[in-house]
Every structure is written in C-alpha cells, then in structure tokens.
Design a protein with these regions (language model features):
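Electropositive polyanion-binding surfaces
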Residues: 10-221
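Structured, non-catalytic alpha/beta "coupling" segments that mediate domain-domain communication
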Residues: 1-11
Length: 221
C-alpha cells in the first residue's frame, strides 16, 4: 500500500542525540522556557501508549479562578528543518498503526522516549496556559510559550476515572483531575448551547474484502 516501512537510514539515525536515552536537557536548552516542573502535570492516554505527546495541569488560584495548562512535546528541538530526519518524517507523514505492529514516522528514541512526556522525566514542550473562571468557563488570560515539564503520572483513562471517583483520594493529582473534569463539562455544555455538532465515533472499524466490478479485490470499511 506504498507505506514507507524500511529501517531508518544511518543519515537519519545520525540526527539523534549522541547521549541516546540518557539525554537530559542542558541549561542552555532551558533558557527562555517557562518552567512547569513543579506543577502537577499528568497525562491521560489509552492503555499501552508509549508516545505520550500531551499532558495537562490544573491549579486552583482561588476566587473561582483556575490555571489550566496543556503541554505538547517539543519535537522541533530534536528535528531541525531540512535535516535528514526532517525529510524522512515528511516522506512518511504519520505513524501507521496496524493490528500487529506500528510503523514509526520518526525513530523510537524520539517517539517513545525523548519526545514522550513520560512521568518522572524532564521533557521539553510547548505550553498553552489559560486563566479560566471555574464556574462559567470564561477565559481571562491566554499564554503560549516553550517550556519544560516533569509529569507526575502517566495514567490510563480508567486510572484517571478511578482517581476522580474515589472520595478518599484527596491527593494533588486526583483534585487536579476533578477540576479538569468539572471544567470540561462546563465547556462542553457551552459548546452544545452554541450549536456544536457532536459526532459519535465507532469503537472499532472493520475492513471487509469485496470483489469490485473490475474483478479486483478491494478493502472497504
């Protein structure tokens, strides 16, 4: 199906940090970056997810104000424009997930490690931080910046829901998740009130082989 699936070339691999999985951000890497390493940042993903590309934090500022941060892995720190790895990623276009394997867009050292917001690891990111009214969802302030984070926890959806539902869990992570959950409900209600189109997505897509009019076999959903 013309999906690029060959091993990464030596030229591409030479673009990776020489420290490998022992890479740590240097002081120079952190200049001009907002520091969110002390915030209660967590990620929520499907079970088995290794390429954690986004994480969240939600802090109570008092007076019905929340600070909400969305942090996205800063892949551009490792992939320079026009480099061999940049050209290879452009050629591949996306990571392809098959039933029995995945075909990475970039080498696993980046996708599953250095550009994955793994809990307990310092990671470079892009952040959008809002100050929001916790009762109305009104946004008071928005700030974008390059940043550095250190996630507190890499949770599955079920693990996050368990923390939200457990009344005995009054830890920082659980309270942050509850604030995010409450705010999400407010924002969703506002979107629906304004006429948002809500589409249900199927949990599973099945492909069926059929015979076309040209007698060639085709795959259809």
């Amino acid at each position: 199906h013309l999906i690029p699936h060959m091993e990464f070339s030596a030229q591409v691999l030479n673009c990776l940090p020489v420290e490998g999985d022992k890479w740590q951000p240097r002081i120079d890497d952190l200049s001009n970056r907002s520091d969110f390493r002390q915030e209660c940042v967590v990620s929520v993903d499907p079970p088995g997810c290794t390429d954690i590309d986004d994480a969240l934090h939600c802090k109570d500022l008092g007076n019905n104000q929340l600070e909400v941060g969305v942090h996205i892995a800063d892949v551009t720190h490792f992939i320079r424009p026009g480099s061999a790895i940049d050209r290879e990623a452009a050629e591949r276009g996306t990571t392809v997930y098959l039933a029995d394997r995945r075909i990475d867009m970039v080498p696993g050292l980046l996708s599953s490690n250095l550009c994955s917001l793994i809990s307990g690891r310092e990671r470079l990111s892009f952040s959008c931080v809002w100050k929001i009214n916790s009762k109305t969802g009104e946004i008071y302030q928005t700030k974008f910046s390059k940043s550095v984070i250190q996630s507190r926890a890499s949770l599955t959806y079920a693990e996050a829901q368990t923390r939200i539902d457990d009344p005995e869990d009054q830890g920082e992570i659980a309270q942050s998740l509850r604030r995010l959950n409450s705010l999400a409900k407010i924002l969703r209600a506002k979107r629906i009130e304004k006429g948002a189109l809500v589409l249900a997505s199927a949990n599973e897509i099945r492909f069926v082989e059929v015979e076309s009019e040209t007698a060639e076999n085709e795959l259809v959903i």
